[in-house]
A protein has these predicted regions:
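Short beta-strand and adjacent tight-turn residues that come in two discontinuous sequence segments
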Residues: 50, 76, 95-96, 115, ...
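Alpha-to-beta junction loops
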Residues: 43-45, 67-69, 87-96, 109-112, ...
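Short helix-initiation/N-cap motifs at beta->coil->alpha
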Residues: 18, 74-84, 88, 97-100, ...
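Beta->alpha turn/N-cap motifs
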Residues: 79, 96-101, 115-118, 173-174
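An extracytoplasmic/periplasmic, membrane-proximal ligand-sensing/linker region
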Residues: 106, 157-218
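Ligand-binding "clamshell"
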Residues: 1-10, 69-70, 104-115, 122-135, ...
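Hydrophobic residues within well-ordered alpha-helices
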Residues: 40, 60, 86-87, 105-108
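Hinge/capping helix and adjacent helix->loop/strand transition within the periplasmic-binding protein
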Residues: 1-81, 130-132, 146-179
Length: 218
C-alpha cells in the first residue's frame, strides 16, 4: 500500500550519490549534449535505459521535460544487455549510472557525453556535466541515484541524533570516502533536515512527471 515517507520514517543522513551518464558508441557523431538535443526534435531517435521506472529512465524523461527534446525510449531489463547493444551499434545512445558504465567507458567501448552530477566525476575529468553543456533548460540540471539512512518514525530523538553522528563520522573516514569514490560514488553526509529537504525537492521534481507520463515500475 502507498505510504508517506514523512510520517512513516525519520531521515537520519544522506549517504552517497551516483550520477547518470549519457553514453554513445565510440564512432558516434554525437560529441556534445547539444548534438544529442539536436536529434531530439521529432521523437524518432532511440535512447536505451535500464528499465521502466528506473532512475535512468526518469533521468532521460527529466532531460526531455527540461529541454523539450523527445526520444523513443528502449527499456531494457537492466544495463547489461543495453551495454552490449550499444557497443554493437544496435542502439545509438544510452542513459546509465556512471558506476555501471565506467568500465566500458575506460576501455573505449563507449564514449561518455555528459554526467548529471553537480560537478565532474573525478574518474572522468574530461567529461562535462550537463549543467556545463550550454543547452537551454539544463543550466541547473542535476539528477543522481542516491541512498540515505532512515529510521522508524517513532524513534526517540536522542537515538536519532546518535545514529546521525555515527553516520557523519563514518562517512568522514578517508578510507570510506575512497571506497565509495572507487565505485564512482560521492559520500554525502548530512543532517536529518537536509536529507528531508532533498527528498522533498526530488518528490516535487519527479512525482508530477511520473504521473504525467503514467510511468509504473515493472
Amino acid at each position: 500500500a502507498p505510504y508517506d515517507w514523512r510520517t512513516a520514517f525519520q531521515p537520519i543522513s544522506h549517504i552517497q550519490s551516483v550520477p547518470a551518464v549519457l553514453v554513445v558508441p565510440p564512432n558516434s557523431p554525437i560529441k556534445t549534449m547539444a548534438d544529442f538535443m539536436a536529434l531530439g526534435k521529432d521523437g524518432k531517435f532511440t535512447v536505451a535505459d535500464s528499465g521502466v521506472g528506473t532512475t535512468n529512465h526518469i533521468a532521460i524523461e527529466l532531460i526531455g521535460e527540461a529541454t523539450g527534446a523527445k526520444y523513443t525510449l528502449v527499456h531494457y531489463k537492466g544495463s547489461g544487455q543495453a551495454h552490449l547493444d550499444l557497443i554493437a551499434g544496435q542502439v545509438p545512445a544510452q542513459v546509465d549510472q556512471v558506476n555501471a558504465a565506467i568500465g566500458h567507458i575506460k576501455a573505449g567501448k563507449m564514449r561518455a557525453i555528459a554526467v548529471s552530477s553537480d560537478k565532474r566525476v573525478p574518474q572522468l575529468p574530461d567529461v562535462p556535466t550537463m549543467k556545463e553543456s550550454g543547452v537551454k533548460g539544463l543550466e541547473n540540471f542535476t539528477f543522481s541515484t542516491y541512498t540515505g539512512l532512515f529510521a522508524p518514525a517513532k524513534l526517540p530523538p536522542e537515538i536519532l541524533a546518535k545514529l546521525n553522528a555515527a553516520m557523519v563520522t563514518t562517512l568522514a573516514d578517508p578510507a570510506v570516502v575512497k571506497r565509495f569514490a572507487d565505485l564512482t560514488a560521492e559520500t554525502r553526509p548530512s543532517t536529518p533536515q537536509e536529507l528531508a529537504a532533498m527528498l522533498d525537492r526530488e518528490e516535487k521534481l519527479v512525482v508530477p512527471l511520473i504521473k504525467k507520463l503514467g510511468i509504473k515500475a515493472e
